[in-house]
Amino acid sequence: MSTTGHRAGVFKKPSKPHKSWKGKRTKGEITSENRGREGVKQLTRSAHSTHRTISKDARRNQLKMARDQKMADAMERRRTSNAPCLVTVVSLGVGARPTEFIKKLATCDETIIQTTSPSTIDFAIPRFKSRVSFLTPDKDNVDGVLDAIRASDVLCFLWPMSAELSEWDEQLLTIIKANGLPTIVSVVPGLGSIANHKKKEDVRKGIEFIISKWSMSNAGVMPADSVTDNLQLLRILNETKKKPLTLQARHSYMLVENLECSDKTGETCTLVAQGYLRGPEWNANNLVHLPGFGDFQISKIESTVDPHPLKAHNKTPEAQIIAKSDDKRQNTETEITPDSMDGEQTWPTREELEEADKELRRVPKGTSSYQAAWILDDEDDEDEEDSDEDMDDSDNEEVEDDSEEEEPMDDLKSEAGETTASEMMFDDGIDEDINMAEVEKYRKERENAQWPDEVDTPMDMPARIAFQKYRGLKSFRTSTWDPKENLPLDYARIFQFANYRNTKKNVMSKIGGNDVDADSVADKKFNGAFASVFIENVPVAVLEAYKDAKNLVLFQLLPHEHKMSVLNMVLKKHPSCTIPITSDQNQKFIFYVGFRQFEANAVFSSNTPGDKFKLERFMPTEKTFVATVYAPITFNPATVLCFRQDDKGRQELVATGSILDSNPDRIVLKRTVLAGHPYKINRRAVVVRYMFFNREDIEWFKPVELYTPSGRRGHIKEAVGTHGNMKCRFDQQLNAQDSVMLNLYKRVFPVWNYSIFNRSLNPSRFVERSRVESISLVNEDAMEE
């Protein structure tokens, strides 16, 4: 065996050397070459993420400081909040009654001191050194339930052991959830009385499944049968972490326990509302909202004797002025009074005057030119304007069906959606015309889905006159549209922010009264104190209206929130509403926006990116949309509930959502599609007919681009003859089955019919889900027949 190894020959090539200049360099080489200079990527990363430029110890110190600040804020809130914890008790299904449930809680501890007020049941619990106030609104009164939840710290649901909810319970849960939820505690009365452990766990899991289905809470359910269970429940109500609503975190509010009238002068008086001061520090310069009546000014806030003390005091404290308004308080001006003379008046030119003299008038036979000059034509002008408004603002109903006769106003209102499904289904005196009107609405919605925005060109008047307010766009996405062009007179009455985001940021930064030295801002030590709020210039009728109100909640307004503007809301149609909802000026909706309730007309538009948005003639079923109304300014986020109401006062939940912004410059464009038929096709040259019916209209709309459903693009070359045929040219050859389309656009605005809504709701005014579904099936059968 040879002991010598292999030796390379003379033809052996050496290994390639490592090329350090190719590929990635080491960190050390990069650092030495940069000499402290940072690249573009590093600069961009540092601008968006500051924690990358600091050390690990510095980041750890920042987290510790933020954690300590949160703990200090929590301790400050506990130290300064002296108001009792408000708990709203809502019973679902056939469970225990709220009053019986509260009576059992009162018997779990002998030291509990129970007092009552017109709106609450109050517990003073020396064992826990705390106070709890219970609200028991009637679940059949939706307004009462929502008002109680807006002011509550905890929402306590009493679930039935069967875990079965009625249609009304599901409807109520939907409204409550859309309105916003505070901290939730779920209680099952009778759960502890089940002896069989397996059966008890099955009941618990069934109820927890229903709770998770509604996405209410993950804390589980609690029994409320024994003394131990009730004590544990009271402890949880006191010590659980409170999650305030956005409404409560931004606005100072008060649950009114006593209402009095003082300094009565004529039809107005000074309203004295007594209750606990809750939320951020009260400011006497800010306005206060009275539900159903509007916004009013505050003169002063005084401390009063607490009617539900934790410990009885022998000495009665004297009344003390907590805050007093000054010359900086907000006024109650909600809109601007427009000046009709504030505008440029352009005098007509000589050519326009000569053209006006050539105007032809219809006069009786045998009338001379001198007599014809004295005939007034105001009525003709009004008729022409009315017909134009009917065509533009009522979805071109006259254009869509020329043979349809003019209907009375009652029928038009029924088409606008003011007849609820429950009225159709369950009234004994049912009217066949109303049924057919509902079927007609379904047909129109189906036609709009199949041929969106398509309109027949009128034959009795020129198209350039019928669509004189419309214009063509080269591209809906990229073409420009001036938001300040051709604004209605109502825009002179509203307010607009120069920069909405900056204004909102400044307003939110001042929440809580940073100017503590001002006499108009209450000190933090008075948070939760029982006080009297003096509201000036309130009509005397308000006291009579609130005589029977149990859950009256006052909210203070932020700056600018009393001013009228254009409010945009992102909504989604509720599944329980299956009837078509049109977007026209005859349909008014009831909106619950935060603590406000008002009626207004809305314009529906698409919720898409861009600077222009397409009008939705019908409320979309599956996707979200934006409703635009004239309403007081409300800073987002804020919850929105949308209802529709018939002439008998019955209401139906239509849509839910939140506030988008307050922007009058939002451009909502109504699209009208004119369709024609390709008469002769010669490769890319096509003769189109039935789109227009005279030569002048073809020349007028010649600059507008044409298209087909298959994606072909073209333009008008010239008119052929005098009966509306025109020669067109497209980018590719057309099929005989294609239709030629032309898009026209017009900006639309909502109608100014804002009014404060001041009626309490009841279950007879709501349409339950099962009834609506059955009615939709009946209407579908009627359409198929």
Swiss-Prot record:
Compartment annotation: Nucleus, Nucleolus
Region (Disordered): 1-59, 307-426
One GO CC annotation: nucleolus
Keyword Nucleus tagged: yes
Signal peptide from the UniProt entry: none
Residue ranges, compositional bias (Basic and acidic residues): 26-40
Composition bias type Basic residues, residue spans: 9-25
Record's keyword terms, sorted: Nucleus, Ribosome biogenesis
GO biological process: endonucleolytic cleavage of tricistronic rRNA transcript (SSU-rRNA, 5.8S rRNA, LSU-rRNA); maturation of SSU-rRNA from tricistronic rRNA transcript (SSU-rRNA, 5.8S rRNA, LSU-rRNA)
PANTHER family: PRE-RRNA-PROCESSING PROTEIN TSR1 HOMOLOG (PTHR12858:SF1), RIBOSOME BIOGENESIS PROTEIN (PTHR12858)
Known function: Required during maturation of the 40S ribosomal subunit in the nucleolus.
Entry protein name: Pre-rRNA-processing protein TSR1 homolog
